[in-house]
Amino acid sequence: MGQKINPLGFRLGTTQSHDSIWFAQPTKYSENIQEDKKIRDWIKNYIQKNRRISSGVEGIGEIKIQKRIDLIQVIIYMGFPKLLIEGKPQKIEELQTNMHKKLNCVNRKLNIAIVKVTNAYKHPNILAEFIAGQLKNRVSFRKAMKKAIELTEQAGTKGVQVQIAGRIDGKEIARVEWIREGRVPLQTIRAKIEYCCYTVRTIYGVLGIKVWIFSK
């Protein structure tokens, strides 16, 4: 059996960079990592609560965190920023003040910025959310996968692979289904591959979605 490494960790330092950038004493590492996890969870929960009900997608591509002694800079890359800020610019300020209180930043400022991702469906997280939404609405998994691949092709990618695992369509025995379009060279380190794994709760149980996108 082939042992599969995470495609993002495999390419760190070549085509991938870290999502969190900060320096700390070795004894403070665990605290900083926990703080990053809390920040990301709070942002996702806040956007889930405040998005428009009609849209089933949160649209978060990635959340980058940069820390200095006196500042925490959080950059949210969103495919559909209108879901959060349309007609409500005070929402970001509200999120900022709530997080500042929860983090207990006494001597540090917290700054949140939202950046729009061009070609949202080039990002695996947004694509996985789209597939999850389709599966929750009981759309056939094959239809959902084909539609997802169409969307990535329109966004101008070189290749995409989608995998769904679990009790697909409510079958009693769990199985794995996958589909690939174009090239996805996982062994080539210099290939820019975006990857994400996403879990979705359906009425039949939990399904795991994995998406690989080869952009350049």
UniProtKB/Swiss-Prot annotation:
What CDD domains would the database entry show? KH-II_30S_S3
Pfam family example for this protein? Ribosomal_S3_C
Coarse class of the primary localization is plastid
- Decide whether keyword Plastid is in the record: yes
Indicate yes or no for the key word Chloroplast: yes
Q: Which SUPFAM superfamilies match?
A: Prokaryotic type KH domain (KH-domain type II), Ribosomal protein S3 C-terminal domain
Q: Name one GO cellular component term.
A: cytosolic small ribosomal subunit
Domain of life of the source: Eukaryota
Indicate the quaternary assembly. Answer: Part of the 30S ribosomal subunit.
Name by which UniProt lists this protein: Small ribosomal subunit protein uS3c
What organism is this sequence from? Phaseolus angularis
Q: Which gene encodes it?
A: rps3
